[in-house]
């Protein structure tokens, strides 16, 4: 029998925020992207941010490589699997009346396909999904701010859940509470993190415990 995790002091603050925004790849889904291979296929220097590099290229070349990136990500979409606890978490939040959205460095079209594929598409209307062509890519807070504005609120009413530094920086800059999901438990960016968990299963358990104590 596993020991119940003691509630984190930040959990009541998370539950008080009626808008939750998720990263998709590696957060709601298990990681499938081989970024080194993608960089090689696109000619992006090792260690460089893929989108940032493509945007520095001449327009015709940038457009061509963005198209190739779209093809790669469309192929990966068919292999996506829900991360542990993803369905449990979004179901618990939905029952609470939380409004949910996605801010991803993928495209909206791929995101819609992935979310349907992993069985959570009904929780995320198309208008609540912002991809790299809909807002400035993370770590810019633009995606969160745009979603919040469309909901008639601000980033300070939101929670941002993600697995990478850019997600946390994006959330912090927008005024959102940030949740870092890290399967390795390294938790490398505490300065940008309000709550750290190893999985969405763990986060779902904390949310359910918090609700039961209200």
Identify the residue ranges that each predicted region occupies.
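Active-site neighborhood of HAD-like aspartate-dependent phosphohydrolases
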Residues: 1-61
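Short, basic/glycine-rich phosphate-binding loops at helix/coil junctions
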Residues: 62-73, 123-128
């Amino acid at each position: 029998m596993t020991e119940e995790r003691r509630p984190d002091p930040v959990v009541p603050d998370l539950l008080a925020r009626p808008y939750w925004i998720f990263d998709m790849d590696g957060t709601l889904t298990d990681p499938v992207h081989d970024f080194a291979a993608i960089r090689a296929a696109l000619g992006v220097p090792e260690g460089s941010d893929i989108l940032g590099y493509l945007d520095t290229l001449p327009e015709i070349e940038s457009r061509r490589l963005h198209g190739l990136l779209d093809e790669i990500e469309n192929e990966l979409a068919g292999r996506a699997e829900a991360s542990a606890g993803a369905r449990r978490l979004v179901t618990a939040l939905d029952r609470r009346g939380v409004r949910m959205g996605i801010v991803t460095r993928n495209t909206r079209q791929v995101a819609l396909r992935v979310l349907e594929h992993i069985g959570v598409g009904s929780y995320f209307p198309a208008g609540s999904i912002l991809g790299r062509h809909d807002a400035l890519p993370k770590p810019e807070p633009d995606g969160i701010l745009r979603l919040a504005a469309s909901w008639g609120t601000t980033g300070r009413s939101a929670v941002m859940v993600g697995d990478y530094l850019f997600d946390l920086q994006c959330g912090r800059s927008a005024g959102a509470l940030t949740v870092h999901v890290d399967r390795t438990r390294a938790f490398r960016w505490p300065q940008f993190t309000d709550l750290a968990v190893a999985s969405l299963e763990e986060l779902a358990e904390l949310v359910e415990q918090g609700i039961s104590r209200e």
